[in-house]
Amino acid sequence: MIMVAREKDLMMVSMGPHHPSMHGVLRLIVTLDGEDVIDCEPVLGYLHRGMEKIAENRTIVQYLPYVTRWDYLATMFTEAITVNAPEKLENIQIPKRASYIRMIMLELSRIASHLLWLGPFMADIGAQTPFFYILREREMIYDLFEAATGMRMMHNYFRIGGVAVDLPYGWIDKCLDFCYYFFPKVTEYERLITRNPIFLKRVEGVGIISREEAIDWSLSGPMLRASGIQWDLRKVDHYECYDELDWEIQWQKEGDSLARYLLRIGEMKESIKIIRQALEVIPGGPYENLEVRRLNKGKDSQWNDFESRFISKKPSPTFELSKQEHYVRVEAPKGELGIFFIGDDNIFPWRWKIRPPGFINLQIPPQLVKRMKLADIMTILGSIDIIMGEVDR
C-alpha cells in the first residue's frame, strides 16, 4: 500500500561559513520548503578578535594598525574614525591641507570599496565579466595608495592632528589622470549591467526595504538612502572639508536590490566629482600638527633637529584622554561607522565601543529572505555589502 505524504517536511540547510557568496565567515541556517525560504538565522562571531578590548589596553597611536583589520577593504575610514575620536574629545585642530588629504583618501577608499562590492555581487548572480573589469580600476587606486602611504592595503596613514606624510611629488597629477580615466569606466559598467534583462530579473523587486523599515532597523549608508531617505553624514555632521565642495547626496526610492546597485554606481561618480574639486583647490602648508609647531617655533625649535625630522621622525604625541565621553561617526561605504568612547584621565581609553554599519545592516536579511527563493539569498546578501571583519570585530 502506497502512503501519500500529506505534509511537506521542512529542510534545514547550513550556508557557510565557507560558501563563496558569504563574503567572509558568515553562516546562515536556512529553513526551506522546497525552494522557498521559511526562516533564516545568521550565525556570527567566527572572525571575532576582541578589537574593543584591545583598544582599552593600547594608546591611540599603538591601536591604529589594528583598526585597518575591521573593514579591510575600506581601511581609510577605520583610521579616520580612530583619530577623529581623540581629536574631537580634546578639541585638536588639524591643518587645512591635512583635512583635504584625508578627504581625498576617504573618497578613493569609498570607490575601491564599491568596486570590490560590485564585482563579487555580479558574480553572485551569475555575471563573471564585471569582476575582471573592476579589478583593473581598483589596482590603479591601490597604486595611488601605495605611492602616498607605502601600502596598498592596511595603510596606517592617518595620525592624530593630520596624516603621517605629505603627498609625494606628482601624486596630484597622477590622481587627476585617474579621475578622468575612471569616470567613463563607470558609464561602461552601466552600459554593461544596468539594462541587462537577466540582471534585472535577479534584482528588480528583490529584497525590498520600505522607508519605515529602514528607520526601524537603524539601517545606514546605501541601505538607508536606497529606501528614499536623504541622509549622509558628510552633509549632516559637516566633518573634514566636504561643505566647501559642490556635490549631491545620492538616493533612490524603490528600496530593492536594484536601487542599492544604482545608488552605489551614483556614489562612485559623486566621489570622483569630490576628488577632482579637492585636488584643484587643495591648499599648501603643513600636513600635521607637529609640523605646525615646528614652523611656529622657528629655526631654534627642537623639531628642526635632523634626528627628529629624518632619522626617528617624532610620532604623534601620546596624551591623556580627559575624563569624559564622546561619540564620533563617519559616512563609511557600508554606512555609519561610529565609536563611543570614554576617557579616564589615562593614555588608554576606559571604554571603546565600535558601531559597525555591517553588523546593524546584517540584522534585516532574515526578514527580507522569508518567502523568497533560495537563489535570492545571494542577491539580497550581496546587495547589503557586508565585511565580516567589521561585523565580528
UniProtKB/Swiss-Prot annotation:
Name of one Pfam family that matches: Complex1_49kDa
Similarity comment text for this entry: Belongs to the complex I 49 kDa subunit family.
GO cellular component, one term: chloroplast thylakoid membrane
Entry keywords, A to Z: Chloroplast, Membrane, NAD, NADP, Plastid, Plastoquinone, Quinone, Thylakoid, Translocase, Transport
Descriptive protein name: NAD(P)H-quinone oxidoreductase subunit H, chloroplastic
Purpose: NDH shuttles electrons from NAD(P)H:plastoquinone, via FMN and iron-sulfur (Fe-S) centers, to quinones in the photosynthetic chain and possibly in a chloroplast respiratory chain. The immediate electron acceptor for the enzyme in this species is believed to be plastoquinone. Couples the redox reaction to proton translocation, and thus conserves the redox energy in a proton gradient.
Main location: plastid
Source species: Cryptomeria japonica
HAMAP family reported in the protein's UniProt record: NDH1_NuoD (MF_01358)
